């Protein structure tokens, strides 16, 4: 539901997976088949999609020969989810992120809803792959996958806390601009996001650090942070500074990350020893890539960790 940055990237990503159990059979987007097919095929950030994308008729597109129905309704209760026997709705509009909103998909006949953003309200459980996904209950009809930044932050925070014990900390998130900002100065509920995205570093709020407590409850009240939106279209970076209980040094911390990346967090966490920049992490599948050269320790108990992530893909 919604075929914007997240919806289109989800479909692109799915097409690269072999033997996936998922099949996209419907898209709800106000743009219709012409917009859906064109924006899926041509992408300013990712380049041309290496797939055969065609308009079949006024209500269908095809991707590599597989037909996908395209509908356009702003009211989820009017969507044909029951008729189409939809198992899972990927809720990617950023609008229906609370129980009353997301439940409209269930009312329309879908079995489950995955919200691709932080949920509003404590009644919707949040799961982050590699952190607490094992707690998932099949009885949950509506779940949240948290934000891109929480998916970056939580895996390596989990390692830090398990190995060294986090006392408290703050995060600065240097984040690429998003569609929620203005291209040129214009009205916005956030006066800073009202300013031209491609011309400014824009300080703004982020709930990502606090949201870590939703998947790692013992860290409730221990983390906070801010975001700086910068003039890049994709890939972001987290700079976390924490006080830890156990005395340590940079190499020991990096080794803990490497051990986790090779073991329990394989495919979720990675460690880079190379001097890379943001564009090098575009379309990186993992949730978080530690930049080992930037790990610092002051006084044996103040730790700085920097991690990259593709905020549209990881």
Swiss-Prot record:
GO terms for molecular function: glyceraldehyde-3-phosphate dehydrogenase (NADP+) (phosphorylating) activity; NAD binding; NADP binding. Pfam families: Gp_dh_C, Gp_dh_N. The record marks 175 as: Activates thiol group during catalysis. The keyword Plastid applies. It comes from the Eukaryota. Pathway: Carbohydrate biosynthesis; Calvin cycle. CDD domains: GAPDH_I_C, GAPDH_I_N. Keywords: Calvin cycle, Chloroplast, Disulfide bond, NADP, Oxidoreductase, Plastid. NADP(+) binds at residues 5-6, 29, 74, 311. Its main location: plastid. It is found in: Plastid, Chloroplast. The keyword Plastid applies. D-glyceraldehyde 3-phosphate binds at residues 147-149, 178, 193, 206-207, 229. Signal peptide: none annotated. InterPro entries: GlycerAld/Erythrose_P_DH, GlycerAld_3-P_DH_AS, GlycerAld_3-P_DH_cat, GlycerAld_3-P_DH_NAD(P)-bd, Glyceraldehyde-3-P_DH_1, NAD(P)-bd_dom_sf. It catalyses: D-glyceraldehyde 3-phosphate + phosphate + NADP(+) = (2R)-3-phospho-glyceroyl phosphate + NADPH + H(+). It is an enzyme of class 1 (oxidoreductase). GO terms for cellular component: chloroplast. Its EC number is 1.2.1.13. GO terms for biological process: glucose metabolic process; reductive pentose-phosphate cycle. Disulfide bonds join 13-283. GAPDHB, the second subunit found in plants, is absent in algae. Homotetramer. This is Glyceraldehyde-3-phosphate dehydrogenase A, chloroplastic. It comes from Scenedesmus vacuolatus (Green alga).
């Amino acid at each position: 539901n919604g075929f914007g940055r997240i919806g289109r990237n989800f479909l692109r990503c799915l097409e690269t997976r072999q033997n996936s159990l998922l099949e996209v059979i419907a898209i709800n987007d106000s743009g219709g088949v012409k917009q859906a097919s064109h924006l899926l095929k041509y992408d300013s950030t990712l380049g041309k999609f290496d797939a055969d994308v065609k308009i079949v008729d006024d209500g269908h597109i095809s991707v590599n020969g597989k037909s996908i129905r395209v509908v356009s309704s702003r009211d989820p209760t009017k969507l044909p989810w029951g008729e189409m026997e939809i198992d899972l709705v990927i809720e990617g509009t950023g609008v229906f992120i609370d129980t009353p909103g997301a439940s409209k998909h269930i009312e329309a006949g879908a079995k489950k809803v995955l919200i691709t953003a932080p949920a509003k309200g404590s009644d919707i459980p949040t799961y982050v792959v590699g952190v607490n996904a094992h707690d998932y209950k099949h009885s949950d009809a509506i779940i949240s996958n948290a934000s891109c930044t929480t998916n970056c932050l939580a895996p390596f925070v989990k390692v830090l806390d398990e190995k060294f014990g986090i006392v408290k900390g703050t995060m600065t998130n240097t984040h690429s601009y998003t569609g929620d900002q203005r291209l040129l100065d214009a009205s916005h509920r956030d006066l800073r996001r009202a300013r031209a995205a491609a011309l400014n570093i824009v300080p703004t709020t982020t709930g990502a650090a606090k949201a870590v407590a939703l998947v790692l409850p013992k860290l409730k009240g221990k983390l906070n942070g801010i975001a700086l939106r910068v003039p890049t279209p994709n890939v972001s970076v987290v700079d976390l500074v924490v006080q830890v209980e156990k005395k340590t040094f940079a190499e020991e911390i990096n080794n803990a990350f490497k051990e986790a990346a090779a073991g329990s967090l394989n495919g979720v966490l990675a460690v880079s020893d190379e001097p890379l920049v943001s564009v090098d992490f575009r379309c990186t599948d993992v949730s978080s890539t530690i930049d080992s050269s930037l790990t610092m320790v002051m006084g044996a108990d103040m730790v700085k960790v920097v991690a990259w992530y593709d905020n549209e893909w990881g």
